[in-house]
Structure formats: structure tokens, C-alpha cells
């Protein structure tokens, strides 16, 4: 088992894995996972010559679990990642995110462009696409509305041996582990608070201005069997990327790409990270008069 360490940053304890040496790669999981999601990617990236940092995001795994909804705004969680990288002496990591971790990675990319090398988003596309979702995507995201009722959602999800939760999750991901993790004190409310604080990732900015362009080289990966996120979200993300953009569709995989297609994901990561230059580095410096 890979050893975890803990550091207190941005007002919360963050547990994390830190393995290997080389250019840093930060892996960000989503709901209802932990750094354990990346168990197939960590050794492959370390063997590929990278330093791999995989935190348990706030509210999950062995990290702190504030119970207030406002503790889970996307800007707060981006600040967690910035503070963690500073604490660990990392200035400009590669960022790889899945599910909510991908949403955080996108936001980090356009808020902190000079603190990012390469970006990889798995399953979840740029929030600008979700600002105007299709009817089909709205229908697929019905569960996000169900999670909005503090106390009621928790009670219904736990009832009858977590029956409803298991029906929502299906047999995908680490389904048995999820129930054990969410049964820990405060864990279910903390996880659902991600949805309550960020009903629409695009609404977090609350601005009429367009999204800042993503300058980093970006890779989007989507699984054809994903029932929660439709292809439109990832396929349409390129228009928000000013740096090099690449989209990959994996046919025999669902939402949990790191588990469903570990070899393909690892191959894509190793073939992409560190291979391109950010858009802001391609500009010629202004000549001084």
C-alpha cells in the first residue's frame, strides 16, 4: 500500500501520496473517490520518470471534512491545490483530473496559467460547455438536483443498506469501497457538499465576461460508456483552449476511465505530458523601445 502523508493547508488537513522524482504530476480525483482512484496510474507515471502527487481532496478519503457547504466552493478547492503545491515546493505541475477533479483542473488552468505545465481532463469537459448544456445532458445529470437537500439526501441514500446510492452508482468504479468511505463520520455530507456548493461549475465565476482561455497544452479523454457525462462536454472543450488541444475517445470504458481503461489512460498520459509548449510561452517577448 502506498503511504500517505498529511499537511495542513488553506484551513484543512490534506492527505496525499507523494511518490517518485522528476517533473511533478498532480492527480485530482472526484466524487466519491480518493487518491486510491489513481492506483494504476501512480506506478506507471513514477516508472515514466515523474514525481506523482495525489491528494485526497477536501471532504474525501483521509483529508479533513468540513460540514459547511461554503467550504466546498471551487475557488476554495483550487486554493487547496495551489497551497499544497507551494507547500511541497512545486511551482508548475502537470495537472490530471477526473470528474470533479477535472472541473477543478479546468478552473485552475484559466485562473493560474503560469502555475501549470500540461492539463489532462478525464470525463468532464470545460465548464464553459456546461454553461449551456443540452437537454440530454440535463437529463443525465438528474442526480445533481437530488443531492441538493441537506439531511434529506443523506437519509435517502443511506436507507436500506445504501440501496439508492448503489442504484445511482451502479457497478461502476470502486462501488463497495465508496459505501465504506462514505459511512465514515461526516463523509457523505462532505461529498454531497461539492454538488451543493457548485450546482453549476460555470456559475462559480458569476461574470458576463467570457472564460479566460486555457493556455496550457490540454488533453481531454472521454469514455464512450459514460452515462453521467455526454461526449458533447469534452468534444466541445477545445474552443476554450488556446494552447495545443487534443481529444481522445476510449470506446470500451465508462465514467471511471482510470479504472476501466488503465493501460490506455497510462499510455495517453505518458505520451502527452511534457510534449507541448503553453501558448503564453510561444509568444515573442515585446521589444523594448
Regions found by a protein language model. Give the residues of each.
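A short, glycine- and basic residue-enriched loop/turn
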Residues: 34-35, 103, 253
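Alpha/beta-hydrolase-fold serine-hydrolase catalytic core, especially in secreted/extracellular enzymes
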Residues: 275-289
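Flexible "cap/lid" subdomain of the alpha/beta-hydrolase fold that forms the substrate-access gate
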Residues: 1-2, 12-17, 24, 60-96, ...
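An N-terminal hydrophobic leader/cap segment in hydrolases
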Residues: 1-5, 289
Amino acid at each position: 500500500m502506498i503511504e500517505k502523508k498529511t499537511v495542513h493547508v488553506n484551513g484543512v488537513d490534506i492527505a496525499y501520496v507523494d511518490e517518485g522524482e522528476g517533473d511533478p504530476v498532480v492527480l485530482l480525483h472526484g466524487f466519491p473517490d480518493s487518491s486510491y482512484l489513481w492506483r494504476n496510474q501512480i506506478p506507471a507515471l513514477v516508472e515514466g520518470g515523474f514525481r506523482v502527487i495525489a491528494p485526497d481532496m477536501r471532504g474525501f478519503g483521509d483529508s479533513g471534512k468540513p460540514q459547511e457547504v461554503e467550504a466546498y466552493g471551487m475557488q476554495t478547492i483550487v486554493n487547496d491545490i495551489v497551497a499544497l503545491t507551494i507547500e511541497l515546493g512545486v511551482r508548475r505541475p502537470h495537472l490530471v483530473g477526473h470528474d470533479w477533479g477535472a472541473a477543478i483542473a479546468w478552473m485552475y488552468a484559466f485562473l493560474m496559467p503560469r502555475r501549470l505545465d500540461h492539463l489532462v481532463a478525464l470525463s468532464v469537459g470545460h465548464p464553459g460547455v456546461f454553461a449551456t448544456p443540452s437537454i440530454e445532458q440535463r437529463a443525465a445529470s438528474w442526480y445533481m438536483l437530488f443531492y441538493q437537500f441537506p439531511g434529506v439526501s443523506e437519509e435517502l441514500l443511506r436507507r436500506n443498506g445504501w440501496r439508492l446510492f448503489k442504484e445511482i452508482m451502479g457497478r461502476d468504479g470502486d462501488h463497495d469501497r465508496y459505501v465504506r468511505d462514505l459511512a465514515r463520520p461526516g463523509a457523505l455530507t462532505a461529498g454531497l457538499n461539492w454538488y451543493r456548493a457548485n450546482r453549476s461549475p460555470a456559475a462559480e465565476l458569476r461574470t458576463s465576461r467570457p472564460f479566460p482561455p486555457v493556455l496550457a497544452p490540454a488533453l481531454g479523454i472521454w469514455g464512450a460508456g459514460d452515462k453521467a457525462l455526454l461526449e458533447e462536454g469534452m468534444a466541445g472543450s477545445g474552443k476554450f483552449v488556446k494552447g495545443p488541444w487534443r481529444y481522445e475517445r476510449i470506446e470500451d470504458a465508462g465514467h471511471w476511465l482510470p479504472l476501466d481503461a488503465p493501460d490506455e489512460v497510462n499510455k495517453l498520459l505518458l505520451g502527452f505530458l511534457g510534449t507541448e509548449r503553453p501558448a503564453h510561452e510561444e509568444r515573442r517577448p515585446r521589444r523594448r523601445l
